Amino acid sequence: MLRVPLADGTLVATPGVPSKDIIPSLLSTSDVFGTGWFAAEAANVKPGMTVAVVGDGAVGLLGVLSAKQMGAERIIAMSRHEARQKLAREFGATDIVTERGDEGVARIKDLTNGIGADAVLECVGTQESMKQAIGSTRKGGYVSYVGVPHGVQLEGQELFFAHVHLHGGPAPVRRFLPKLIDLVLNGKVNPGKVFDLTLPLEQVAEGYRAMDERRAIKTLLRP
């Protein structure tokens, strides 16, 4: 027996039974891919834009993939982890920035001729990551924030003179599901690559531990 809460509104059927090899990608559409897609949409990503992504977890990496699908010309991924940098490039990143904080902002300004990115996706939720996102954005640009905030406080005057658009919050994933599922079924994207650790359900605690210790990007649990 399987119980799906509010299935009339939340359950989206696939056209037939999908093959096992795309199950991880389909699973991602209902969570991290949907959130990454919202991050790109909320940042108003358009064809030809320069986009920066703060955060190299599953959501940030799929924010890179989403920005690529939306036509971004240049995508700067901020990451210090080699395996995640490699995946970011597979998903469409053109540049990698390893610096953080003020140094990270300066590096993005260097890469954009002192202007800043047209759009920045904040996918972490810390004070430092939010300041880094705002500081990396050009005047009149867009910042989306989908990382659950942890002690984030924005200084009013600093935000006022930054002159950027802010849009974020919990991702309305259900709205994107039909499109994202279609992208997966048609072989246009492979977001399931973020699942780099597979464990049996009884080892769920180890799965969370591995993600917390940065030994895994995303854990896939099997019964």
Regions found by a protein language model. Give the residues of each.
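C-terminal hydrophobic helical "lid"/dimerization subdomain
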Residues: K131-G135, R174-P223
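A generic alpha-to-beta junction signature in SAM-dependent methyltransferases
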Residues: A43-V45, T112, V124, S136-R138
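NAD(P)H dinucleotide-binding glycine-rich loop of Rossmann-like/cofactor-binding domains
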Residues: M1-V54
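Rossmann-fold NAD(P)-binding glycine/threonine-rich loop
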Residues: G147-H163
